[in-house]
């Protein structure tokens, strides 16, 4: 019977990936379609992906699939062909290729079955997730940005918006996607006559959000096909002005793709212009925050003097201090003046 999960340590897998000589391509894709047996589908896809040496994070549910992966360059076309042949619903599926890629985005394959591929908190039995808004292509996006009757709604989390967004786009002040959905409806109630344009990193969140807005009585709703990634790629290919400002946050080891030269965020420690996210080097903290090179040297990669001091302690003393304390990654929320606790690199589906 084939092994359908990883049995090698995370450190060993990362070292193995870093030692690889073959380049890799970072790809993301999603598809809303009915999967009758997510567990069986998961096991079959795990074998397919493993055979092609694919790393990454994949979620499956009855509502579809959501994946961010790293594929050896020589296997990309084989992967594409086998994915398209796996299920008729996946034939011709758009694969978003990373805009900036060092091939080091993932080093282990994690594939999980979930209740939803995007945690939306929707329990309305009358909600039709397939009744989505209209797609916008790159040229149409730019035209909408110049339309005074159009409002651009960013359906990403605050730390994503902080480092990059479309010109004049509105931020929905929430920590998770499930919190954003009702807030988006509430914030836009006075603007039902406007054209609502929704976007996210790769399209999965804004597609569902567009359906939710239509479900709540908004009739003029659009969303950007392929999200920021596909927009930037097509705009560059077609010689169009790229109207996204700053960096596109991504949920892997890269933590960002440069879209424009502007740096619109600031170091969370000294306030200098900076849009580089990092995790606090203190194993008892791992706060996700923005840190400039000067502060990185000053605080030795930590988020505070306290964490800097603690990370210098002997390992046993660090473990003693962490005992009984809430650990795991935290996210610095500058707009709210507090921290949010999550597990691992922030999950775009939450």
UniProtKB/Swiss-Prot annotation:
Query: Which catalysed reactions does the entry list for this protein?
Result: uridine(34) in tRNA + AH2 + O2 = 5-hydroxyuridine(34) in tRNA + A + H2O
Question: Which domain of life does the protein's organism represent?
Answer: Bacteria
Question: Which intervals hold domain Rhodanese?
Answer: 146-240
Q: Might you name a Gene Ontology BP term for this protein? A: tRNA modification
Q: Which UniProt keywords apply?
A: Oxidoreductase, tRNA processing
Q: What is its EC number?
A: 1.14.-.-
Q: Which InterPro entries match?
A: Rhodanese-like_dom (IPR001763), Rhodanese-like_dom_sf (IPR036873), Rhodanese_C (IPR022111), TrhO (IPR020936), TRHO_N (IPR040503)
A Gene Ontology molecular function term of the record: oxidoreductase activity, acting on paired donors, with incorporation or reduction of molecular oxygen
> Is the keyword RNA-binding assigned to this protein?
no
Where do the catalytic residues lie? Answer: 200 (cysteine persulfide intermediate)
Q: Main EC class of this protein?
A: oxidoreductase
Similarity-based family: Belongs to the TrhO family.
Q: What does this protein do?
A: Catalyzes oxygen-dependent 5-hydroxyuridine (ho5U) modification at position 34 in tRNAs, the first step in 5-carboxymethoxyuridine (cmo5U) biosynthesis. May be part of an alternate pathway, which is able to bypass cmo5U biogenesis in a subset of tRNAs under aerobic conditions.
Q: Which PANTHER family match?
A: TRNA URIDINE(34) HYDROXYLASE (PTHR43846:SF1), UPF0176 PROTEIN YCEA (PTHR43846)
Protein's recorded name: tRNA uridine(34) hydroxylase
Q: Which organism is it from?
A: Escherichia coli (strain SMS-3-5 / SECEC)
